[in-house]
């Protein structure tokens, strides 16, 4: 895990190395100063040698300023390294996220991904900065200060040696108790983020159903749960503070008592005792730093594991070794295809799909909710891979195509229409970044979007709010259809993408398809018979199987499911 994360350091290796080197130099200066202070007291002050006092005092000041300079430089380099590391980590996570297939994305909640990219990265960044500074500073200071204390007086130094195991035991207890709590707490952060995200996204529904109190209750429940875990974790961590302070005061009292006896017996000088107090503080401070590092690592370990999960997730769908780079035409072949989201053929949502669709053919798809219509069309651009059987586009197995090539030649307008923050032009150019204004207008005319766009004060430069909240559902659908048309695809798939437009507009869109893109294979999933009745053929899907294929007239005559849907809609229209 650590090796995987450190790959994100990359161009920030230099500051990552410089920071600990500069910290080491800072520590050397800090450890040297108590020794100089000891000499200043014993040889200067006690003997009344003011020249020695001035000389040694100046040397102490020089050491202090050098130490400060090293400290400032190490802080700057550590900040540069940790911020760069976090930037690369976010980039690597987001880049890997873009390679995910739908099945990979299904493993993570949106709120969890956001938490990993923000909170978790910040935790790891703080830990990294602490490691390249404090984790270097603490052991070096501990070793140097301990060696210097033994050099001054071994008897007093042994007191400090006995305190370390007590502190180490405390740190182990804290780590073992706190880590599982932090793991649980970060999972609850995902739940809380999910509650907030759902509430913000569905705020209009919440308001219309007067469910504010219910939503507040959901948020309060998870918020209180996080608070309870945080209290438990802090309780464990706070145990470390009193233990540290008790150790510090115990050490100081013992050193004062033993040191005073040694000074009285002329076994130790006043300057050495003063320096010993300084080294005691340095040793105990370094142990406190180790304690801080342990606490930070407890928090960041959980975050690091969650980040690694996202970084180590490999896409289920990848390019073949020698991919086909051209789609010849829009013909589609399903050869006894089975598909299951769980990769278990026994739980297939598509079973024994066998069909040939000619290039340029218009295919209507009818079926009940959950019958497998969307699953069927999502296999064509290889958003998922079939569990069994073969799927061909243009006579070539879709698994042999370059992913970008097959998806560029298959335009999908999904059930959930998504518009991004930006102008209408910017949203349309998702279909073709190089599209001219004339091409955009033509696509919008086919999609019956040009009329309402032209009615906006800013026309095609109208700004679309996040999620397309300032356009209606029908307008959003037509913009998404126009965006798909700009790809100039060989296959166009509409997944119930005209459900929010009236039947007259729907008919105009179908007429535009027939007139302007006759060579494009068109697959139209619809709930309304009127949307597909003029298709070359209509597929009736029932419980994951092809129930019937035929023209509108043929199905109306021979298929009970189609006839039932038609009669119910006809009756509803008459009423």
What are these regions (language model features)?
Residues 325-575:
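ABC-type nucleotide-binding domain
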Residues 47, 83, 91-115, 119-121, ...:
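Short intracellular "coupling" helices and adjacent cytoplasmic loop segments at the cytosolic face
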Residues 26, 30-34, 62, 67-82, ...:
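Alpha-helical transmembrane segments
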Residues 11, 15-28, 39, 60-63, ...:
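Transmembrane helices of ABC transporter permease
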